[in-house]
Amino acid sequence: MIDAKLERILLRVQKPARYTGGEYNEIIKDKAAVDVRFAMCFPDTYEIGMSNLGLRILYGSMNQAEGVWCERAFAPWGDMEEEMRKEHIPLYALESGDSLKNFDFVGFSLGYEMAYTNVLNMLDLAHIPLHSDQ
């Protein structure tokens, strides 16, 4: 679900299709019909994440479980991150467009150590506090 504010900023970034979802084999479920919503995050760009076989296997497997909807989120490129921060748009899942902070679980697939800082950046962009007391 792309709202008007997001639609405006997509006109100002490179490769806007990486932020819209809607691709072939995307799994959409009825929010009211699921018990658990899981945000599967990959701390790199869409192109890198979608070429990761492990992520694709987990996405498919989790969505086969009854009552579970697994959605995807990727680290935005610098131009998109800048626009999202400027317009106060939190990091969102591709399938529903919902902010990551609205999910029951948020998980990350880490392929290498250099991605650790992107995890922190994605949590910050999603307005998810790093400490439970916040």
What residues fall within each predicted segment?
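A short, structured N-terminal alpha-helical element that caps or precedes a catalytic domain
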Residues: M1-Q134
